Amino acid sequence: MNRRSPAFTARLIFTGVALASGGIAFYVPLLLSTVGLAHSGAWAAGILFGTNLGRLAGSHLASRHGVFTQRRGAIVGNILLEGAALFSMAFIAAPAGLVAVATLAGLGSGLSFPGMKNALMRLQGMDSARLFAGLSLALRLGMAMGYLAGALVGASHLVAVFSVLLAMFVGYAAFMDLAMRGIEAADVDVPQAPIAVGSTPGAAADVPAVAPPSDMTAMLLMNAAFWFLTIQPTVTMSLYVPRYVPGLAVSTTYWVTTVTVLLLQMRVTRLPRGAAGHRLFLAIGIVCMAASFATMALAGSHVAPVLVAAVLLALSQVFYSPSLDVLVTGDARARGLDLGKTMARQLFWQNLGMMSGSLFAGALFDQALRLGTPSLGWSVPATASMALLAAWALGMRGKRN
């Protein structure tokens, strides 16, 4: 494979993303369970809240200023900012300090992630659906390794965990730097056809205009709601499992979810056909999420239902995430929008959902503890998932009429 080929460049990006996601997966369950047991579920959720608050601010800036999604130095620098901020967590004991540093790390993530996705879209002749599926696969492969490492290491070695995490982010920055150099060289070497004002030079030309312009706002709002709900297990599993299923390692459910995605993502991505197929996959993803929450509400202290719920949660992401990316990208293409800014806008709404959802999850878990009804932390999200599905179905029916 030629070092300048788009496929090679995509693999560089995917390798870097896998390193970063592995680092995040390595520390998150360990830190959340440690803080949750030592302080409260609200403080544990506050760390994710701070992370997503920073991502929200970063993605907002990236959606307004193209330098953050186009310039190699800005993308690489913000990756290093995130890694350095996370490393400093190894030396902070106060939960408020952890929240503050998590916010700074989130800022770096929110500024760099849209640029990474935009870089993928600048690759010549690459199929967009496969690129997004490959990105999801890289994220999950890294997460699988990170969760497995976390299960083996445990929460008593956090300095070592964060040292490894820093090295992984340095690796991500290096791979992204190499990839961006290749993309910049390709943009110079390949003459560009005239493009619409505001579109991204060098982006993959095969992205279909699968979503009419009027769908964008509805998709972004639904995406915020979806991630509001999807973030619930990230918080609640870390708090629920040590208390109610103590025989199960806290990272196991995350690992099961990740391995399921790895096994199915590329196969499932080939199935949808056109806009209708991708919209159907969004609905299937929401149904799987609701089923996962309902299973957890009935799980009690049994291991098997917890693992089944982890598989269902994985299926929700397998069906939902790549299809949403394809629909948003298709809409941006149809309207001649800057892809980098569009990706940043999508990330803004996603982080808004995750930020508010993480705080809600921690507060809901604490309330469930006070009431002595642990199922409350799962039955409320299950009901909300069905409400989201109904709203989406009604919206799509209205558009057809």
Question: Predicted regions span which residues?
Answer:
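Juxtamembrane intracellular "pre-TM" segments in multi-pass secondary transporters
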Residues: 1-8, 180-222
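Helix-loop boundary and gating motifs at the non-cytosolic
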Residues: 2-52, 215-255
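Structural signature of the two symmetry-related core transmembrane helices
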Residues: 73-87, 280-295
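A late C-terminal transmembrane helix in Major Facilitator Superfamily
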Residues: 337-369
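Cytoplasmic helix-loop-helix junction between adjacent transmembrane helices
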Residues: 103-141
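Intracellular juxtamembrane helix-capping segments at the cytosolic ends
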Residues: 31, 111-124, 319-335
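Helix-to-loop junctions at the C-terminal end of transmembrane segments
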Residues: 57-70, 154, 263-278, 365-366
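A membrane-interface helix-boundary motif in multi-pass transporters
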Residues: 154-167, 363-387
